[in-house]
């Protein structure tokens, strides 16, 4: 009996196992390896497009790297693009055949339109005649109307994303920034029964393999990632057992395996064998099996829901990408070795030290073995770039909570300082010397941390987790990439009020003050800074060598402003490990140069933006007074002064929430920071601890709850209602959905720049920009820099041609009604159909009309019609690799 043949070519491959046994081939999507890549076509902001061939038919294959989308937190946009194209069956929208993937890439296999994009055609023509522009705008308007009726907003409409078919018609493409209102995954019925195509033509029919590929999961998260959602609870149980040995909080010991030599491995093993039976040494973080238990796939680190969680690098004690051998995306460039030990401050620690020394190893040997820099005893000269290695701790004075636990936690981070920061450097050096002498007398084990700086630190410094104060006059160096025609992420948009420092949100939409997208230049700031720890509980390792996005746990402030500014809230069941920082931002201006993923907090005011800096961070405990009376363990608790109480009770400034590294959060290491709710600072019992000459640290407690020091790790605290949405009392512009502004500057609608809720009207605004560009050859709001473009958009500054170049009244009026600031009054499909400029358009038969330009390629693989845009924007496309 002959086997039944399948209806698809991609169904081949199954064979008959016996003479009398029939096997029906199961439809399956093809593999990307079945496609032959002919040549590159073009490159966009989030992927590259190649000309592919399979079975004698040509396809346009868009390749998107999963790692890039995870790092940019754009996985949901890849899903939205696939869904939007899969749901669309319109003659004016590019047809999607397959959605394929490999371990590293996502492949969207679409129809190849040989005519190139309209941007390239516009570069060749200079500008279009009115008749030609009207035909193109009419077809794009039909495409937008189709998308909007199906709940899809394009949000990146521009001539670059309009392709020309073989017959010269327009088809929209590049839905990478689109918004699909379908609040669920698409299924087979969505693909087969698109509402507008009750009886689809043969052109829109899809084979079973195509349908299966279009509804498949894109694999940004795997079953392993789902299991990791409960891994923190498992770790908490394990930590609970081991915490009985150390009677202290857990802090991870982070050692990069690639930097560990055989000698250092021997030292580590010796230390483990020596201190394991000793209950006075917290060795739980040195156990190797924890590394195995936390191993997970690299692709499991983010999903479409991951933006609601905080990075797991800080939130889970034993989770670090440096412990995972399978996460090797550029990690080889990092040459750091970081250690952080927490030793209980008890006389029994002396015995532990003696025990280690009896085996022939001491801490200095281990220190030298783990760091490639052996000359760590010499402190560099003040005012020069330096790396502080193995700084000594400050056991003389610790916070009240740490003293109750008999814990001495030291956290020293790498500090690359310039001459403007000699005060903080000198403070650290003096304290280290005094502490070394003090430790020699008391015989306690010292806490230490080794940080080896990497040559690539400047490259990855925008991925770090420090916060930099920068004066306003240092923010006007310009925008590095002066081209405004490419899709980009508008990372920083600061709206200012003309004529003074007012807080009236009604005036904040008048102009855009600055838009900066450049590398950090912390050396330019002349203000001396020092990093202050905002956490009451034990600090963890700052993880300086991680190239991924980290949450910040400290805020830089000048020496004269740090007093009475830090408020540390004790963790409760609802908000474990949250510290609150209240700072007067009227006295200084902050640089807004940061991305949403790199920020560790949610802005409470649109003017209160902070700058991410990888440089000036040094998390330290309050400096202890040299007076032995103050260092005595029976230190008195001083009552807060009236000035401090007034600051706490009368100040109504916005607060910024920071989450402790020890907080219990299930998260991925590439996720966006969560937006945490914050309890009111009013009505709290306040206790004050004074630590020598260092400024006060105010520790308010919740009313009605007595303070009990931690006897367990904060990871064991169950959070009651995390990630609650804040009450509707926010001043200023409403935040955008995901907090980011994505798109090309020239085509962004005002509501996007103002951070307001937006809808389909943003596409009609972009259509008005395209109409003006078709008629003149230049976008209406073009300027030299993006910030100037934004000012022109908000002012609606349109340079109308004059004289012989003057546009017709109908054309100018059509642009006017589309470029209306008020999105409620902006023209749409109905207004365009009634407009005099489109009076001669046959809207029902647009796809059958003769187009003014019909491509005439040399052969079917000709891509020359895309070259004009690529050359104008200096785009080069690299090779292809599976």
From Swiss-Prot:
Annotated Protein kinase domain residues: 35-838
Listed InterPro entries: AGC-kinase_C (IPR000961), Kinase-like_dom_sf (IPR011009), MASTL_STKc (IPR037638), Prot_kinase_dom (IPR000719), Ser/Thr_kinase_AS (IPR008271), Ser_Thr_kinase_AGC (IPR050236)
Domain of life: Eukaryota
PROSITE patterns: AGC_KINASE_CTER (PS51285), PROTEIN_KINASE_DOM (PS50011), PROTEIN_KINASE_ST (PS00108)
Gene Ontology cellular-component annotations: centrosome; cleavage furrow; cytoplasm; nucleus
Molecular-function GO term, any one: protein phosphatase 2A binding
Name of this chain's protein: Serine/threonine-protein kinase greatwall
Organism of derivation: Ailuropoda melanoleuca
Primary gene name: MASTL
């Amino acid at each position: 009996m002959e086997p039944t043949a399948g209806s698809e070519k991609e169904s081949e491959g199954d064979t008959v196992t016996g003479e009398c046994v029939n096997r029906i081939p199961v439809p399956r999507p093809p593999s990307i390896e079945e496609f032959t890549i002919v040549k590159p076509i073009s490159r966009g902001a989030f992927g590259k497009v190649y000309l592919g061939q399979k079975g004698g038919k040509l396809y346009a294959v868009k390749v998107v790297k999963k790692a890039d989308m995870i790092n940019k937190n754009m996985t949901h946009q890849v899903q939205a693009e696939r869904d939007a194209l899969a749901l669309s069956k319109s003659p004016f929208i590019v047809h999607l055949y397959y959605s394929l993937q490999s371990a590293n890439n996502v492949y969207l296999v679409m129809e190849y339109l040989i005519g190139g994009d309209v941007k390239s055609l516009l570069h060749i023509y200079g500008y279009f005649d009115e008749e030609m522009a009207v035909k193109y705008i009419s077809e794009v308007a039909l495409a937008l109307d189709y998308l909007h009726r199906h709940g899809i907003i394009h949000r990146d409409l521009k001539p670059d994303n309009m392709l020309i078919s073989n017959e010269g018609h327009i088809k929209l493409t590049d839905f990478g920034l689109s918004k699909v209102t379908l609040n669920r995954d698409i299924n087979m019925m969505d693909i087969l029964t698109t509402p507008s195509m009750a009886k689809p033509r043969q052109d829109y029919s899809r084979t079973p393999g195509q349908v299966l590929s279009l509804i498949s999961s894109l694999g940004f998260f795997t079953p392993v990632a789902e299991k990791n959602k409960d891994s923190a609870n498992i770790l908490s149980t394990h930590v609970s057992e081991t915490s009985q040995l150390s009677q202290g909080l857990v802090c991870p010991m982070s050692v990069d395996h690639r930097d560990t030599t055989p000698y250092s491995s021997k030292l580590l093993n010796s230390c483990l064998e020596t201190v394991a039976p000793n209950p006075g040494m917290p060795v739980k973080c040195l156990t190797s099996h924890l590394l195995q238990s936390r191993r997970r796939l690299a692709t499991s680190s983010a999903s479409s829901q991951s933006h609601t969680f905080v990075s797991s690098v800080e939130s889970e004690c034993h989770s670090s990408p440096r412990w995972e051998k399978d996460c090797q995306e550029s990690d080889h460039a990092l040459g750091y070795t970081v250690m952080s030990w927490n030793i209980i401050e008890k006389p029994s620690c002396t015995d532990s030290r003696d025990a280690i020394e009896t085996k022939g190893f001491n801490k200095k040997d281990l220190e030298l073995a783990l760091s490639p820099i052996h000359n760590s005893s010499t402190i560099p000269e003040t005012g020069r770039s330096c790396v502080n290695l193995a700084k000594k701790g400050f056991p003389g004075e610790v916070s009240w909570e740490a003293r109750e636990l008999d814990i001495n936690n030291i956290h020293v981070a790498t500090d690359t300082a310039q001459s403007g920061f000699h005060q903080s450097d000198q403070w650290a050096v003096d304290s280290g010397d005094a502490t070394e002498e003090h430790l020699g007398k008391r015989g306690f084990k010292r806490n230490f941390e080794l940080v080896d700086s990497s040559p690539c630190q400047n490259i990855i410094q925008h991925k770090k987790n420090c916060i930099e104060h920068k004066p306003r006059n240092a923010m006007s160096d310009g925008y590095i990439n002066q081209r405004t025609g490419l899709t980009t992420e508008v990372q920083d948009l600061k709206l200012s009020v003309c004529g003074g420092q007012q807080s009236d949100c009604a005036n904040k939409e008048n102009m855009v003050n600055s838009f900066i997208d450049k590398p950090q230049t912390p050396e330019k700031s002349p203000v001396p800074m020092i990093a202050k720890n905002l956490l009451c509980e034990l600090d963890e390792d700052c993880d300086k060598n991680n190239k991924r996005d980290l949450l910040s746990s400290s805020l830089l402030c000048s020496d004269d402003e740090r007093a009475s500014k830090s408020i540390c809230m004790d963790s409760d069941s609802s908000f474990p490990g949250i510290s609150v920082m209240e700072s007067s931002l009227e006295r200084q201006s902050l640089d807004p140069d940061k991305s949403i993923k790199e920020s560790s907090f949610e802005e409470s005011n649109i003017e209160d933006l902070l700058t991410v800096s990888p440089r000036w961070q040094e998390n330290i405990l309050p400096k202890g007074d040299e007076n032995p009376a103050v260092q005595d363990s029976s230190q008195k608790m001083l009552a807060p002064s009236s000035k401090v109480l007034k600051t706490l009770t009368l100040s109504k400034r916005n607060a910024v929430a920071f989450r402790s590294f020890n907080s219990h959060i299930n998260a991925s290491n590439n996720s966006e920071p969560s937006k945490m709710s914050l309890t009111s600072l009013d009505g709290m019992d306040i206790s004050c601890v004074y630590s020598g000459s260092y400024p006060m640290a105010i520790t308010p407690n919740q009313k009605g709850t007595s303070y009990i020091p931690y006897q367990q790790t904060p990871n064991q605290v169950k959070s009651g209602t995390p990630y609650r949405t804040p009450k509707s009392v926010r001043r200023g512009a409403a935040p955008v959905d995901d907090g980011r502004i994505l798109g090309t500057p020239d085509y962004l609608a005002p509501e996007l720049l103002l951070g307001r809720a937006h809808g389909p009207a943003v596409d009609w605004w972009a259509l008005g920009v395209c109409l003006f560009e078709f008629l003149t050859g230049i976008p209406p709001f073009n300027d030299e820099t993006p910030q100037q473009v934004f000012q022109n958009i908000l002012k609606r500054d349109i340079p109308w041609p004059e004289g012989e170049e003057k546009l017709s009244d109908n054309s100018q009026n059509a642009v006017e009604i589309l470029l209306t600031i008020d999105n409620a009054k902006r023209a749409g499909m109905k207004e365009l159909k009634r407009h005099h400029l489109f009076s001669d358009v046959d809207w029902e038969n647009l796809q059958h009309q003769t187009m003014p330009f019909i491509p005439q390629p040399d052969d079917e693989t000709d891509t020359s019609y895309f070259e004009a845009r690529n050359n104008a924007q200096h785009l080069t496309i690299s090779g292809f690799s599976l």
